[in-house]
C-alpha cells in the first residue's frame, strides 16, 4: 500500500493562533491549567494529578485525505524536533477513547525521523522478562515507553501531543507526518555528531558542562582533596554505633518497640541506605548503526583496569574513569565509590567494591531459568527447574555464606506477569510442551475460566518461590532472603507471598510511598519493607527525567530528603536503595532508556545541590525512624 503523506499538516501556534507554514510549532505551557491524573510508574500504586499541556488536531484539519481507519498500516512516521529531552505523550484519539505512548527523544534540539510501530498503540507487549523489557522499545534517535492505554485504531478522530508538567516552556516542531507499511528507519536528520568525547549531548547547554579535559581534571582534583567521611554515627558495618541489640555475626531483622530494624553483625541497629549499580561498571550504549552520532570512541590503547578490561565502544564513563585514574582505573574507581559512600551517609553497595575498604552489600542472585520463560515465569514444574535452582544457588552462595558484610540477597526483579495472570496462562498453553503446560491443561480440565487460570499461575509462582528459597537456604543459612524486588502494583495475592521471605522488597517510584498502601502491604506480608528502587531526575542534561521528575538538581535533593524521611517514619521500613549510581547514556542503554537519575554523571562528577539533601536525610534517619524527630515535610517542585 502506498504511504500517505501529510503534505498539508497544519498546526496552530499555541500562543498566537497563527497558522504554521513549513514548520509547525507548538509550545508546551509550563503554566497549563488543564490537569490530568497519571500513575507514577507503569501501573503503580497511586494516581497523581499534574498540569498537562496538550495540542490536538482533528484529522480533517491535518489532511482531508487521511483515512480514519489506520488498522491496515504498520507505521506512523513523523519528522519532529523537541527542544528538550523531557518526554511527551503521543496520543491517538478514536471513537472508543484515547491511545497513547511515552515518546523520549534523545537529547533534544535536533530533527529526527521517527517511525513508530502502530502495534504499540494496540496492545501491551508480551516480550521481555521484567517490566522494563516489556515497556521500553528503542529506536536509533529516540525510545518509547509502551504503557497504553491501548485499543483498536479503526476510527481515528485526531492526533495529539501532550507534555506532563513541562519544565521551562519547551517547544516541539513537526514538519512531516505520514502513514506507511514499510519502515523507513528512524534517524537523526540534523548535523552530526551529537555526542562529544566525554559522552555529553553536544546541542545541550547547562551549568557545569565539560568543555575540556583540563576542566574535568580540576573538578576531579577538588573532589579528591575535599572528600572526607561524614558524621553519621555509623559503626564499621554501617549500623548506629550507640545502639545495641543481640549480635549474631550476621545481619538479621528485629522488631523493637513496634519498629522494624536490620541488626548488623555486631548488634547495632541498621537502616540500609544504598544505591543500585555502585562502582566502575559502565553505562554503555549501542554504537552499531549509529557510528556517526559520536565525535569519538574510546581508543584501543587506553590503560587497562585491574581486571584487564579496557573501555569498549560506547563506554564513555569507562573512558572518563581511565582518564582520571589510569592503569587499574576500575579498582581505583570502586575505592573512590566507597569514599563517596562514607562521605554521603550511604551504607549498602551492590557487591564487594574494595577488599581494602569493606562496606555492607546486598546482591542479586541469578534466577534459575528453564525455557521457555514467559514474562519472567519459567517452566517451574520441570525437574530441570529444581536442579537448576539447586546448582545456581550452590555456585553463587558457597563463597558468600560466611561473609559478615553481606546484608542478604534478592532472588528476582520486577517480573512482568503480575496482574496479567490469565494472559500468562494463555502464553503457556500456546507455547511448546512443558511440564507446566501439562499441569495447567489438567487443572483447566475441570473448568477453564480467567479465575482458574489466575489460581493456577499464583500456585505455580508459590511453587517457584519455595523451590528457589529452599535451594538458597541450603547453601547459605546465614543471610537474609530479601525476596523479589516487585515493581508496579501486583495483586494482593502476589504480595501476600512475601511472607515466604525474611524481608519484603518493592520498587516504589513515588514522591513518597503512600502510608495506607504501606500499612496494607505489611498486613499482607507481616514482613519489614525494603525499598529496592526509587529515584528522581531532571531533563536538563540531554537525558529524560527518569520515572519521577523534578525541576532541577536542588529539587532532586529536596525530593530525596522528603521521600527518605517520610518513609523512614513508617514502622515497617528498614531501608531504601536508589536507582542508580550512574546516569544512563545520553543515547540510551540497550533498551533505549536514557534517564538522568545518577548520583554520578557520565563525567564522574556529583551534584553538590543534590547531595545536600542526601546528607541531611541520612544524618536524621535514625531519630526519624525511632519516632524522636518529625520527618522532613517540604515537597520538591516538579517543574
Label every model-predicted segment.
Residues 160-168:
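Short beta-strand-plus-loop segments that form exposed binding edges in beta-rich domains
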Residues 205-362, 372-405, 452-459, 467:
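Active-site-adjacent substrate/metal-binding segments within catalytic domains
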Residues 36-58:
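Short carbohydrate-recognition loop motifs
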Residues 275-291, 358-371, 401-404, 411-445, ...:
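Aromatic- and acidic-residue-enriched segments that line the glycan-binding/catalytic groove
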Residues 50-147, 152, 168-170:
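Extracellular ligand-binding interfaces
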Residues 425-437, 441, 579-639:
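Aromatic-rich peripheral "rim/lid" segments of glycoside hydrolase catalytic domains that contact
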Residues 406-408, 412-413, 534, 548-599, ...:
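Substrate-binding cleft of secreted/luminal carbohydrate-active enzymes
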Residues 293, 297-300, 347, 442-562:
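Extracellular glycoside hydrolase catalytic/binding regions
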Amino acid at each position: 500500500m502506498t504511504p500517505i503523506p501529510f503534505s498539508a499538516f497544519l498546526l496552530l501556534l499555541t500562543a498566537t493562533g497563527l497558522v504554521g507554514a513549513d514548520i509547525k510549532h507548538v509550545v508546551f505551557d509550563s503554566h497549563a491549567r488543564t490537569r490530568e491524573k497519571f500513575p507514577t510508574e507503569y501501573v503503580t500504586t497511586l494516581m497523581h494529578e499534574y498540569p498537562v499541556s496538550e495540542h490536538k488536531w482533528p484529522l480533517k484539519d491535518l489532511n482531508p485525505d487521511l483515512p480514519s481507519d489506520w488498522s491496515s498500516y504498520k507505521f506512523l512516521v513523523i519528522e519532529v524536533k523537541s527542544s528538550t529531552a523531557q518526554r511527551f505523550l503521543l496520543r491517538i484519539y478514536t471513537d472508543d477513547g484515547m491511545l497513547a505512548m511515552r515518546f523520549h527523544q534523545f537529547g533534544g534540539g535536533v530533527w529526527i525521523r521517527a517511525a513508530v510501530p502502530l502495534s504499540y498503540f494496540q496492545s501491551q507487549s508480551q516480550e521481555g522478562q521484567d517490566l522494563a523489557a516489556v515497556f521500553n522499545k528503542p529506536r536509533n534517535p529516540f525510545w518509547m515507553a509502551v504503557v497504553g492505554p491501548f485499543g483498536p485504531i479503526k476510527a481515528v478522530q485526531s492526533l495529539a501531543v501532550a507534555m506532563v508538567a513541562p519544565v521551562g516552556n519547551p517547544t516541539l516542531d513537526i514538519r512531516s507526518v505520514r502513514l506507511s507499511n514499510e519502515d523507513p528507519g528512524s534517524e537523526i536528520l540534523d548535523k552530526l555528531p551529537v555526542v562529544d568525547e566525554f559522552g555529553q549531548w553536544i546541542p545541550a547547554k547547562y551549568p557545569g558542562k565539560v568543555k575540556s579535559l583540563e576542566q574535568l581534571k580540576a573538578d576531579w582534583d577538588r573532589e579528591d582533596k575535599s572528600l572526607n567521611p561524614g558524621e553519621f554515627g555509623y559503626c564499621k558495618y554501617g549500623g548506629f554505633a550507640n545502639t545495641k541489640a543481640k549480635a549474631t555475626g550476621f545481619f538479621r531483622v528485629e522488631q523493637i518497640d513496634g519498629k522494624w530494624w536490620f541488626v548488623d553483625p555486631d548488634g547495632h541497629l541498621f537502616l540500609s541506605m544504598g544505591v543500585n549499580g555502585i562502582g566502575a561498571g559502565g553505562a554503555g550504549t549501542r554504537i552499531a548503526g549509529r557510528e556517526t552520532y559520536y565525535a569519538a570512541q574510546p581508543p584501543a590503547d587506553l590503560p587497562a583496569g585491574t581486571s584487564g578490561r579496557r573501555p569498549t565502544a560506547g563506554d564513555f564513563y569507562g573512558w572518563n574513569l581511565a582518564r582520571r585514574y589510569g592503569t587499574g582505573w576500575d579498582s581505583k574507581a570502586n575505592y573512590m565509590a566507597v569514599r563517596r559512600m562514607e562521605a554521603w551517609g550511604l551504607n549498602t553497595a551492590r557487591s564487594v567494591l574494595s577488599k581494602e575498604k569493606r562496606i555492607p552489600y546486598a546482591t542479586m542472585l541469578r534466577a534459575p531459568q528453564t525455557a521457555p520463560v514467559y514474562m519472567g515465569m519459567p517452566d517451574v514444574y520441570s525437574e530441570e527447574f529444581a536442579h537448576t535452582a539447586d546448582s545456581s544457588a550452590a555456585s553463587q552462595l558457597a563463597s558468600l555464606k560466611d561473609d559478615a558484610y553481606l546484608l542478604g540477597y534478592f532472588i528476582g526483579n520486577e517480573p512482568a506477569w503480575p496482574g496479567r495472570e490469565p494472559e500468562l496462562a494463555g502464553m503457556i498453553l500456546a507455547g511448546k510442551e512443558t511440564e507446566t503446560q501439562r499441569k495447567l491443561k489438567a487443572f483447566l480440565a475441570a473448568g477453564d475460566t480467567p479465575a482458574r487460570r489466575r489460581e493456577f499461575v499464583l500456585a505455580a509462582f508459590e511453587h517457584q518461590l519455595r523451590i528457589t528459597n529452599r535451594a538458597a537456604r541450603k547453601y547459605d543459612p546465614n543471610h537474609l532472603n530479601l525476596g523479589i524486588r516487585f515493581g508496579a502494583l501486583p495483586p494482593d495475592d502476589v504480595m501476600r507471598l512475601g511472607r515466604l521471605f525474611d524481608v519484603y522488597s518493592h520498587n516504589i517510584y513515588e514522591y513518597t510511598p503512600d502510608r495506607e498502601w504501606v500499612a496494607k502491604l505489611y498486613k499482607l506480608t507481616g514482613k519489614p519493607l525494603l525499598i529496592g528502587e526509587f529515584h528522581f531526575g531532571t531533563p536538563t542534561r540531554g537525558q529524560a527525567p527518569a520515572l519521577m521528575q523534578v525541576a532541577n538538581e536542588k529539587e532532586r535533593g529536596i525530593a530525596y530528603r522528603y521521600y527518605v524521611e517520610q518513609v523512614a517514619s513508617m514502622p515497617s521500613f528498614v531501608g531504601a536503595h536508589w536507582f542508580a549510581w550512574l546516569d544512563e547514556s545520553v543515547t540510551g542503554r540497550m533498551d533505549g532508556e536514557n534517564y538522568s537519575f545518577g548520583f554520578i554523571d557520565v563525567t564522574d562528577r556529583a551534584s553538590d545541590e543534590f547531595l545536600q539533601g542526601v546528607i541531611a536525610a541520612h544524618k536524621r534517619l535514625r531519630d526519624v525512624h525511632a519516632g524522636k524527630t518529625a520527618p522532613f515535610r517540604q515537597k520538591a517542585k516538579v517543574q
